[in-house]
Amino acid sequence: MSILLQIRDITKRFGGLQALTRVSFDLSQGEILGLIGPNGAGKTTLFNTINGVYRPDEGRIIFRGQDITGKKPYHLAKMGMARTHQIVRPLNDLTVRENVMVGACFGHENRSLHQAREIADQVLAFVGLEGRADQLAGSLNVAQKKRLEMARALAARPHLLLLDEVLAGLNPAEIDGMVQTILKIREQGITILMIEHVMKAIMNVSDRIIVLDYGQLIAAGTPQEIAHNQRVIEAYLGDPRIAEQLMEEQVYHERSGNP
């Protein structure tokens, strides 16, 4: 399996605050890689550094064999990188279809409106919003706005999709539906790096998981390995709810006979 994304010794500072310290990992083509960590661990900062919102102070980012360190988001969109955002902000006064057409054109200036509309309709059907295409985006509920955010990113036809807490604020049925959509995205050949706090979901959907704490990579491995990792559990002890979820995962894997 070929390497799609290489993160090498990424360090990011904001004044006297060191948000990331020498973070390194690889992401293989077709993989779903989960990124977890306590609040304030540096997860979204890492996303913003990967997709060009921030330039790292040190380190290199290699995407599809090219050094993209410091490149702007629209350049990366043209190369095949797209992302969603933790706080969903659709263009409320545009229709759902028009929002997705914007995503289809970002970084792809040569696409015609006709092409953008065709892509938008295909993607809306894929995420289950085809019946909402002519509604104003501002009229959607939270779960629908999450799907719209994902549709805008998919409309760019990415090789790599960065998902920032797409499950936050969803009920259990909506989470299950979104997880199925994420798996369908991978079936399309799209590689996924996702930040998530819904532990059971990310444990079930990820091939591997990496863990940040205070801006440092403290663990990497399969979901089973992460659920058993004492350092990861200790990092989450400041959030008893998530620490409990991790320990529940550990008990589940022990009872099921998984390593």
Feature-to-residue mapping (PLM):
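Glycine-rich phosphate-binding loops of nucleotide-dependent enzymes
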Residues: 2-259
